[in-house]
A protein has these predicted regions:
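Short hydrophobic beta-strand element within catalytic cores of glycosyltransferases
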Residues: 289-292
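Aromatic "clamp/platform" in nucleotide-sugar-dependent glycosyltransferases that forms part
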Residues: 272
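Conserved acidic donor-binding segment of nucleotide-sugar-dependent glycosyltransferases
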Residues: 304-305, 309-316, 325-330, 345
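Nucleotide-activated donor-binding/catalytic signature segment of Leloir-type glycosyltransferases, i.e.
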Residues: 234-252
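Glycosyltransferase donor-sugar binding loop
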Residues: 48-52, 193, 220-234, 250-251
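Donor nucleotide-sugar binding/catalytic pocket of nucleotide-sugar-dependent glycosyltransferases
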Residues: 131-176
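Conserved donor-binding/catalytic core segment of Leloir-type glycosyltransferases
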Residues: 15-17, 182-209, 223
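Short alpha-helical donor nucleotide-sugar binding micro-motif in glycosyltransferases
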Residues: 251-252, 259-264
C-alpha cells in the first residue's frame, strides 16, 4: 500500500510512515487506531515503508516510499513526519526516512515499538551503534511505550530525556463485557492471541499443560490464534497428546478475536520480550483475567494478583500453577478481569488522541521557534 489520504483539513498536516495497513500485527493496529481518530484539525497521509511479499516486492515498496516521502516534503505543506519503527530492518529503513525528513527541515516524531530493540541494538557492531544513535538523536521527539523503555533509550542512545515521551498504546474499550460465570460449555476457555513462536512463549504455554493435574486439564480449553509457527505448534500439540485440550488457529479477523474474547475467561501471553502488546490491552479491555510475564512495558501495567498474574518467562511449572489457580477459582478470575478492565480505561482512544496531538503541537511549535531563533541570529 502506498500513499493513503485519511483526512483533508486546514489544521496540522502529518506524514505517517510505517508498515502497510494490510499487514498483521500490533504496529498496524496502532497505526489504524491513530488514523481512525484523525479529526478536522489534523490531516494524516500514510506511507507504507514495508509490505508483505518477496524481497523484490518489499524493496520496490520501500523505494516507492522514499519517493513518496521526498515528493510530499518537496511539494506538500507538511508540518511533521511521524515514523513508526521497531528493530532490525525497520531500524535501518526508518533511518533513511529520518535523514530525508531532516534534510527537508521537517520535525520528526519517532514512535518506537520494537520488543527486541534492546537485544538488536546491543548486538550491533560498535560503528553501527554509533551511526544509529546519531540518526535517532536527529529526531525532535521520541515516543516510547513505557518508563522502562524510556530509560533504555535515554541511556543507550543518549537521547535527551525531555525529548522522550511515554505514550502507552491505545485500545478500543467495549461499552459492555459479558458475564463470564464458570467457563464455557463446562470448560474454562483460555486464549492466546499473537505471533506464534518462542518470543511470545507459545511453545512454553503448550508444554506447561503437561504439569496440570488431569482433572484441571479436563476443565481447560485453550485456543491459540496467530501467524508464525502455527504448524510447528500443531505438531507439538499432537506429539504431547493435547489435541482435545488445545485448538490452534491461524491469524483470525478482529471480528473472530472479539467473539472469542467474549467467550473466554483468561488471556495468556508468556512472552520473553515485549513493548506493550496490543493483544494484552485488548484482552484487558474485555475484562479477561490475564497471565503474562514482567517484560518490556508489562510490569508498568500489570501488578501481580491485583489486575493479573505475572510468571517468569520460560518457567513452565510457574505458568502451569497460574493456569491451575484460575481454572479452579472463578471468583479470582472475575476480580482480576474486573481490575484489568479498570486499568486500561485511561488508554481509550480519546485520551490517546489528545496526548498524541499534544505531542504533535509541541514538537511543531518547538521546531518553528528554533528555526526563527536561528534566522534572527
Amino acid at each position: 500500500m502506498g500513499l493513503l489520504k485519511i483526512v483533508v483539513c486546514s489544521g496540522m498536516k502529518i506524514l505517517m510512515l510505517g508498515e502497510g495497513l494490510n499487514r498483521k500485527g500490533g504496529i498496524v493496529s496502532v497505526q489504524k487506531l491513530i488514523l481512525e481518530q484523525a479529526d478536522s484539525m489534523v490531516e494524516i497521509d500514510h506511507i507504507a515503508t514495508l509490505v508483505d511479499g518477496s524481497p523484490i516486492k518489499k524493496s520496490q515498496a520501500f523505494l516507492k516510499a522514499l519517493f513518496d516521502l521526498s515528493r510530499n516534503l518537496l511539494l506538500g505543506d507538511v508540518d511533521l513526519v511521524h515514523i513508526h519503527v521497531s528493530e532490525r530492518g525497520s531500524a535501518f529503513r526508518q533511518s533513511f526516512t529520518t535523514l530525508i525528513s531532516k534534510l527537508f527541515g521537517k520535525p520528526v516524531v519517532m514512535h518506537t515499538h520494537g520488543s527486541e530493540f534492546h537485544e538488536f541494538y546491543n548486538h550491533l557492531p560498535a560503528f553501527l551503534r554509533i551511526v544509529l544513535g546519531w540518526i535517532y538523536r536527529k529526531c525532535d521527539r521520541f515516543i516510547v511505550l513505557s518508563e522502562s523503555w524510556k530509560e533504555f533509550y535515554v541511556e543507550a542512545l543518549k537521547l535527551k530525556e525531555q525529548n522522550v515521551s511515554v505514550l502507552p498504546n491505545s485500545v478500543r474499550i467495549p461499552d459492555q463485557v459479558p458475564q463470564r460465570g464458570d467457563g464455557h460449555d463446562g470448560k474454562v476457555l483460555f486464549v492466546f492471541f499473537g505471533r506464534i513462536g518462542q518470543r511470545k512463549g507459545a511453545f512454553d504455554l503448550v508444554r506447561s499443560l503437561l504439569h496440570l493435574p488431569e482433572r484441571d486439564r479436563a476443565r481447560l480449553w485453550l485456543v491459540m490464534a496467530g501467524d508464525g509457527e502455527a504448524d510447528q505448534l500443531r505438531d507439538l500439540v499432537s506429539e504431547l497428546g493435547l489435541d482435545s485440550t488445545v485448538t490452534i488457529k491461524d491469524w483470525i479477523s478482529p471480528q473472530e478475536r472479539e467473539a472469542l474474547s467474549k467467550k473466554a475467561c483468561v488471556f495468556v501471553l508468556p512472552s520473553y520480550n515485549e513493548g506493550l502488546p496490543m493483544a494484552l490491552l485488548e484482552a484487558m479491555s474485555w475484562g479477561l483475567a490475564v497471565i503474562t510475564t514482567p517484560v518490556g512495558g508489562i510490569p508498568g501495567l500489570i501488578k501481580h494478583k491485583e489486575n493479573g498474574i505475572l510468571v517468569e518467562p520460560g518457567d513452565t511449572y510457574q505458568l502451569a500453577s497460574a493456569i491451575r489457580l484460575l481454572i479452579e477459582n472463578e471468583a479470582l478470575r472475575s476480580d482480576l478481569g474486573r481490575a484489568a478492565r479498570e486499568s486500561v480505561l485511561p488508554f481509550g482512544a480519546d485520551s490517546y488522541w489528545k496526548a498524541l496531538t499534544d505531542i504533535y503541537s509541541s514538537t511543531i511549535y518547538s521546531s518553528t521557534t528554533a528555526k526563527r531563533t536561528a534566522t534572527n541570529r
